[in-house]
């Protein structure tokens, strides 16, 4: 089955052609550079640019896959969660294409896409632990099947990648913050600043994460530099922030490994490409897997891949399905299933 996957939940305009859920025939992504000067994604600009480029991105995906549009068997599109304007552009385009080509439509949860992405290139048996690290999500889950996912922990405030972006913005390190902080940290002292590590000891929160305290402490350090008329040491700030940001992850992961006795961990999302994080994870007594870099960040291939499996099991989505910027809160509580 040939599936066109469309992903437009944030600022990346993505489309891919995937055969039978795993064979990637094309994977096109157009990143919007217009947001860099704002040090963050501007929703209105993102949706306008999606409107401008989504057709050409899909056309390129079809051309690169060396197929004709009529050969598409299924259209999969991200419908939630994300920026509502961006989601609407993607889902409305997918609906129009579905009607024009007379092909079924399947609406996909963006998080399910990230959880499935590593399985397109990695052979691993269920169950296993999954960690999603991105600008919008920080989620630790136990996967029993592609559609049977138990949320163990999640961020209670800022996502990991979001904290990177906000710190980078205040220190004018550039956008996106993740790769810029990682680069600066290589020349810094990671123990120059003792930023707080937030760990929850209550049973119901033992796998949860928090980044608001770390982010605030890091930003307040900038004010201390100014008050004392000291030089701002971006390299040391980046190194210290990065160290603590990932130490915040390690303890909940260790707890999950011990409590579930599962020794397999998949890490996906844009932050998963950070090499410092990968070195820290090596110290855990667990088999660790990462998708290729192009599948770590937002992409259409993961939407097409999981769309194929969801369609085979559940059938097509109603054409009336709307975009939804958020998932219901219960989806993120301990023990909930996506």
Curated annotation (Swiss-Prot):
UniProt keyword annotations, A-Z: Acyltransferase, Cytoplasm, Iron, Metal-binding, Transferase, tRNA processing
MF annotations from Gene Ontology: iron ion binding; N(6)-L-threonylcarbamoyladenine synthase activity
GO cellular component: a single term: cytoplasm
Gene Ontology BP annotations: tRNA threonylcarbamoyladenosine modification
Gene3D superfamilies to which the protein is assigned, alphabetical: 3.30.420.40
Protein EC: 2.3.1.234
Cofactor: Fe(2+)
Superkingdom, natural source: Bacteria
Positions annotated to bind substrate: 132-136, 165, 178, 274
Known catalytic reactions: L-threonylcarbamoyladenylate + adenosine(37) in tRNA = N(6)-L-threonylcarbamoyladenosine(37) in tRNA + AMP + H(+)
Compartments where located: Cytoplasm
Sequence positions that bind Fe cation: 110, 114, 298
Details of cofactor binding: Binds 1 Fe(2+) ion per subunit.
HAMAP family in the record: TsaD
Entry similarity comment: Belongs to the KAE1 / TsaD family.
Protein task: Required for the formation of a threonylcarbamoyl group on adenosine at position 37 (t(6)A37) in tRNAs that read codons beginning with adenine. Is involved in the transfer of the threonylcarbamoyl moiety of threonylcarbamoyl-AMP (TC-AMP) to the N6 group of A37, together with TsaE and TsaB. TsaD likely plays a direct catalytic role in this reaction.
Name of the featured protein: tRNA N6-adenosine threonylcarbamoyltransferase
Source organism of the structure: Borrelia hermsii (strain HS1 / DAH)
